[in-house]
């Protein structure tokens, strides 16, 4: 049997990225400022973490204009949603001392 920690996602596991993914999982899309405020980090920290999540294919970034101002919207991709679901299941399995569902090793 394989320990559930082996199912943890190294991209999402970092606390800030986990918080970002969890926040995006609860909405269809969030604007940059709202997400920054929800996760309580700086603009530069959010930009850096979003770049890593986007590179992994976990987050989609959409830019547009509201009036004359540039606005950035973020959403969790299907790949990101699946990774978050697996990661949370692994955390729950670790916390409960049981193997993750579907693990027959």
Ranges and model annotations:
Residues 57:
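Glycine-centered, phosphate/nucleic-acid-interacting loop/turn motifs that mediate DNA/RNA or nucleotide
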Residues 4-45, 64-75:
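N-terminal helix-turn-helix DNA-binding core of bacterial DNA-binding proteins
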Residues 50-51:
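Short, hydrophobic-biased segments on the C-terminal half of alpha helices
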Residues 61:
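Short beta-strand "wing" residues that participate in macromolecule-binding interfaces
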Residues 1-5, 19-23, 79-105:
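Amphipathic alpha-helical dimerization/coiled-coil segments
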């Amino acid at each position: 049997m394989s320990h559930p920690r082996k199912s943890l996602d190294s991209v999402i596991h970092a606390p800030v990225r986990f918080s970002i993914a969890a926040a995006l999982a609860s909405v269809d899309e969030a604007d940059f400022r709202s997400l920054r405020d929800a996760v309580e980090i700086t603009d530069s920290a959010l930009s850096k973490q979003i770049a890593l999540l986007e590179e992994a294919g976990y987050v989609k970034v959409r830019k547009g204009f509201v009036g004359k101002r540039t606005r950035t919207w973020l959403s969790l991709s299907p790949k990101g949603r699946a990774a978050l679901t697996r990661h949370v299941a692994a955390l729950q399995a670790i916390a409960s001392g049981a193997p993750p569902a579907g693990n027959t090793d």
